[in-house]
């Protein structure tokens, strides 16, 4: 359950401009510790840009982003990873020259909680077991299926023991069986109290996993509330879901 008295992440009036294009405009929200927050909206609404701002891949034009009170806006991706934010990507990003175990271990070396040697190997192997790849450690990541590469990317993000986990369309491109497995994996993280922001188009996942949702359209927040509340909102239906999905 979200912690009512602990704010993990605070986004205050964040704007990101690319020349004359405003990708995110005056966006504000708070993420409670142990909360799973859904960030939804149509393509091009600014969701992934917001994830890039939080993770340090982009610098805000204005506004502030605080992780447990520490200003992290624009300090850079490596420093933000060290401070405790880990992510997956819309398109899976593997380290192609490394094995599965080595990919996961990279998260433990460069992230928030650092491990080395046998401790790191054992921890990475335990994470592979957790995501359903107990025997894949020595396999080249390029030999894996798409869903298994996603599992590795999730394990690598978890290897840093992040304070906040960002999942950017982690369920995209999965078939129905893979989708069921993927939702179950994220549900395990939710049950154990992870603090997560999910960008997702799979509404079943949003309904079942998220405590609260923020809906973006054209770079601005148009709705905020529980999944049930925002998915019934008329403006959200017009902007994103369509009448058939109401």
Walk through the language-model features, giving the residues of each:
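Glycine-rich phosphate-binding loops of nucleotide-dependent enzymes
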Residues: 2-246
């Amino acid at each position: 359950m979200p912690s009512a008295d602990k704010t993990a992440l605070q986004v205050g009036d964040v704007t990101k401009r690319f020349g004359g294009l405003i990708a995110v405009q005056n966006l504000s929200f708070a993420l409670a510790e142990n909360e799973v927050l859904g960030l939804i909206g149509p393509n091009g609404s600014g969701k992934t840009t917001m994830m890039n701002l939080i993770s340090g891949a982009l610098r805000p034009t204005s506004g502030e982003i605080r992780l447990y009170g520490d200003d992290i806006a624009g300090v850079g991706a490596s420093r933000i990873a060290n401070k405790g934010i880990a992510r997956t990507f819309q398109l899976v990003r593997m380290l192609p020259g490394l094995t599965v175990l080595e990919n996961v271990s990279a998260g433990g070396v460069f992230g928030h909680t650092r491990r080395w040697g046998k401790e790191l190997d054992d921890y990475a192997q335990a994470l592979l077991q957790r995501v359903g790849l107990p025997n894949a450690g020595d396999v080249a990541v390029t030999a894996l299926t798409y869903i298994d590469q996603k599992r590795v990317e999730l394990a690598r993000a978890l290897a840093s023991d992040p304070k906040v986990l960002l999942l950017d369309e982690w369920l995209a491109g999965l078939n129905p069986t893979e989708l069921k497995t993927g939702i179950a994996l994220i549900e395990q993280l939710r049950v154990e109290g992870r603090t997560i922001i999910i960008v997702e188009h799979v509404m079943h996942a949003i309904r079942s996993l998220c405590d609260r949702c923020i809906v973006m359209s054209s770079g601005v927040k148009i709705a905020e509330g529980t999944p049930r509340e925002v998915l019934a909102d008329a403006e959200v239906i017009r902007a994103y879901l369509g009448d058939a999905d109401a």
